[in-house]
A protein has these predicted regions:
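Short gly/pro/ser/thr-enriched loop/turn and capping motifs at secondary-structure boundaries
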Residues: 81-84, 104-107, 184
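Short beta-strand elements at the ligand-binding edges of bilobed clamshell
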Residues: 96-102, 195-198
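Phosphate-binding beta-alpha-beta segment of Rossmann-like dinucleotide-binding domains, i.e.
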Residues: 101-152, 164-167, 178
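Residue-level detector of anion-binding/catalytic polar loops
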Residues: 28-29, 96, 118, 122, ...
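An N-terminal-biased, well-structured beta-alpha scaffold segment characteristic
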Residues: 1-98
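Rossmann-like dinucleotide/phosphate-binding beta-alpha-beta segment
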Residues: 25, 138-215
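Conserved beta-strand edge residues that scaffold enzyme active sites
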Residues: 36-37, 104, 130, 183, ...
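Short gly/ser/thr-rich secondary-structure transition/capping motifs
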Residues: 33-38, 56-57, 132-141, 189-195
Length: 215
């Protein structure tokens, strides 16, 4: 829409077709390049008129940026986390900040299991052997790997993602132990997961999966 009466929203990155259709009906948009690590020069030129900012986690919404946006009314951060957004600075200006909690829980848990399976079954090593011509014939112990069934998985951080990993690992017949500073023991019981000190987890686990913030 080019109606100048509609609010101006800056979208930091080019997104797949159709993702912005609903937004397009309610505002004017200026959209940045696909792989931007910072706000493009073109978008910076529109900051004084912007009423909305739609960002990805590579864009720092900090004091320096906010000082250029006197009309800004909302920040929407397309990420579960919001470390890239200065919440205090936004709060002082009365600017609400939105994010997308939970959107990556299943995908991250699936990827965790995929990595664990690849490591346990030495899939990457075997694949490289086959591709590089080193594999010659079958062997009863060639790239044998390790069973997940019966192995102990230690999860550090039993939040949404850690719990989703536990659900999947239980289906593989793994024993689940976890360490968390504020454990939900009732939820853990439902997942057949045992809370243990971190030192015990490190000592007793066959696999360890971390699901905690960097801080």
């Amino acid at each position: 829409m080019n109606n100048s009466s509609l609010p101006l929203v800056l979208v930091s990155h080019t997104l797949p077709d159709g993702w912005l259709d609903n937004l397009e009906n309610h505002c004017r948009m200026v959209i940045g390049p696909k792989d931007a690590n910072e706000l493009s020069t073109e978008l910076e030129n529109f900051l004084p008129e912007a009423e909305g900012l739609f960002t990805l986690l590579t864009i720092n919404v900090n004091e320096a940026l906010l000082s250029k946006t006197p009309k800004l009314k909302v920040v929407s951060n397309m990420a579960v986390g919001y470390d890239n957004v200065d919440l205090d600075a936004c709060t002082q200006r009365g600017i609400p900040v939105g994010n997308t909690p939970g959107v990556l829980t299943d995908g991250t848990a699936d990827l965790t299991m995929a990595i664990m399976l690849a490591a346990a079954r030495r899939i990457i090593e075997a694949n490289l052997d086959a591709r590089q011509g080193r594999w010659k014939t079958w062997s009863p112990t060639g790239w044998l790997g390790k069973d997940l069934r019966g192995a102990t998985l230690g999860i550090i951080g039993m939040g949404q993602i850690g719990s989703a990993v536990a659900e999947r690992a239980t289906g593989f017949g793994m024993k689940i132990i976890f360490s968390d500073p504020d454990p939900d023991l009732e939820k853990a019981e439902g997942l057949k997961a045992k809370h243990v000190p971190l030192e015990t987890l490190i000592k007793d686990s066959d696999f360890i999966s971390l699901h905690i913030p960097l801080t």
